[in-house]
Amino acid sequence: MVFDPRTLDNPKEISAYRDQRYQGTVRDQETALRTSCTLYVGNLSYYTKEDQVYELFGRAGDVRRVIMGLDRFKKTPCGFCFVEYYTREDAELALQNISNTRMDDRVIRADWDAGFIEGRQYGRGKHGGQVRDEYRKDYDPERGGYNRAIAQKGGDRQ
């Protein structure tokens, strides 16, 4: 049986990830998610390179492009990317077979995205990276160490 997200009764089951700044109605966003060829990929190491993402996600089909997430101030990788495929079917294969696998010793997560728009490659946290990293309390060397608030206090070694 092939998974077809266009037949779901509950649109929230389509994607746990939602762009909070989506310009449009919830219904528009749900329609875009049901027909999109774009995946949001999170929990990447800050050291993961674009060619690594192409190589892994290319196993599922023809990748149109990869857009690496960047710290909006430093313009350095900040742990996420968007992967665009030419077809929905290839994106579905990637979602089914690559999400929750390891890349650079990290379990990555992929989910549907409504479609990349210029500017979304930049982190939205107040320090320029991802918001989720600003709430992280543990030390994570693959994602910049401590979050910046803890780092400014000298680290939380508990």
Swiss-Prot record:
<feature type="binding site">
    <location>
        <begin position="130"/>
        <end position="131"/>
    </location>
    <ligand>
        <name>mRNA</name>
    </ligand>
</feature>
<feature type="binding site">
    <location>
        <begin position="120"/>
        <end position="124"/>
    </location>
    <ligand>
        <name>mRNA</name>
    </ligand>
</feature>
<feature type="region of interest" description="Disordered">
    <location>
        <begin position="123"/>
        <end position="158"/>
    </location>
</feature>
<dbReference type="InterPro" id="IPR027157">
    <property type="entry name" value="NCBP2"/>
</dbReference>
<dbReference type="Pfam" id="PF00076">
    <property type="entry name" value="RRM_1"/>
</dbReference>
<dbReference type="GO" id="GO:0005634">
    <property type="term" value="C:nucleus"/>
</dbReference>
<dbReference type="GO" id="GO:0006406">
    <property type="term" value="P:mRNA export from nucleus"/>
</dbReference>
<keyword id="KW-0539">Nucleus</keyword>
<comment type="similarity">
    <text>Belongs to the RRM NCBP2 family.</text>
</comment>
<keyword id="KW-0943">RNA-mediated gene silencing</keyword>
<keyword id="KW-0694">RNA-binding</keyword>
<feature type="binding site">
    <location>
        <position position="17"/>
    </location>
    <ligand>
        <name>mRNA</name>
    </ligand>
</feature>
<dbReference type="GO" id="GO:0035195">
    <property type="term" value="P:miRNA-mediated post-transcriptional gene silencing"/>
</dbReference>
<dbReference type="GO" id="GO:0031053">
    <property type="term" value="P:primary miRNA processing"/>
</dbReference>
<dbReference type="GO" id="GO:0005846">
    <property type="term" value="C:nuclear cap binding complex"/>
</dbReference>
<dbReference type="GO" id="GO:0000956">
    <property type="term" value="P:nuclear-transcribed mRNA catabolic process"/>
</dbReference>
<protein>
    <recommendedName>
        <fullName>Nuclear cap-binding protein subunit 2</fullName>
    </recommendedName>
</protein>
<dbReference type="GO" id="GO:0000339">
    <property type="term" value="F:RNA cap binding"/>
</dbReference>
<feature type="binding site">
    <location>
        <begin position="109"/>
        <end position="113"/>
    </location>
    <ligand>
        <name>mRNA</name>
    </ligand>
</feature>
<dbReference type="InterPro" id="IPR035979">
    <property type="entry name" value="RBD_domain_sf"/>
</dbReference>
<comment type="function">
    <text>Component of the cap-binding complex (CBC), which binds co-transcriptionally to the 5' cap of pre-mRNAs and is involved in various processes such as pre-mRNA splicing and RNA-mediated gene silencing (RNAi). The CBC complex is involved in miRNA-mediated RNA interference and is required for primary microRNAs (miRNAs) processing. In the CBC complex, ncbp-2 recognizes and binds capped RNAs (m7GpppG-capped RNA) but requires ncbp-1 to stabilize the movement of its N-terminal loop and lock the CBC into a high affinity cap-binding state with the cap structure.</text>
</comment>
<feature type="compositionally biased region" description="Basic and acidic residues">
    <location>
        <begin position="130"/>
        <end position="145"/>
    </location>
</feature>
<comment type="subunit">
    <text>Component of the nuclear cap-binding complex (CBC), a heterodimer composed of ncbp-1 and ncbp-2 that interacts with m7GpppG-capped RNA.</text>
</comment>
<dbReference type="InterPro" id="IPR034148">
    <property type="entry name" value="NCBP2_RRM"/>
</dbReference>
<keyword id="KW-0507">mRNA processing</keyword>
<feature type="binding site">
    <location>
        <position position="40"/>
    </location>
    <ligand>
        <name>mRNA</name>
    </ligand>
</feature>
<dbReference type="GO" id="GO:0031124">
    <property type="term" value="P:mRNA 3'-end processing"/>
</dbReference>
<dbReference type="GO" id="GO:0034399">
    <property type="term" value="C:nuclear periphery"/>
</dbReference>
<feature type="domain" description="RRM">
    <location>
        <begin position="37"/>
        <end position="115"/>
    </location>
</feature>
<dbReference type="GO" id="GO:0042789">
    <property type="term" value="P:mRNA transcription by RNA polymerase II"/>
</dbReference>
<dbReference type="InterPro" id="IPR012677">
    <property type="entry name" value="Nucleotide-bd_a/b_plait_sf"/>
</dbReference>
<keyword id="KW-0508">mRNA splicing</keyword>
<dbReference type="GO" id="GO:0045292">
    <property type="term" value="P:mRNA cis splicing, via spliceosome"/>
</dbReference>
<dbReference type="GO" id="GO:0000398">
    <property type="term" value="P:mRNA splicing, via spliceosome"/>
</dbReference>
<dbReference type="GO" id="GO:0005635">
    <property type="term" value="C:nuclear envelope"/>
</dbReference>
<dbReference type="InterPro" id="IPR000504">
    <property type="entry name" value="RRM_dom"/>
</dbReference>
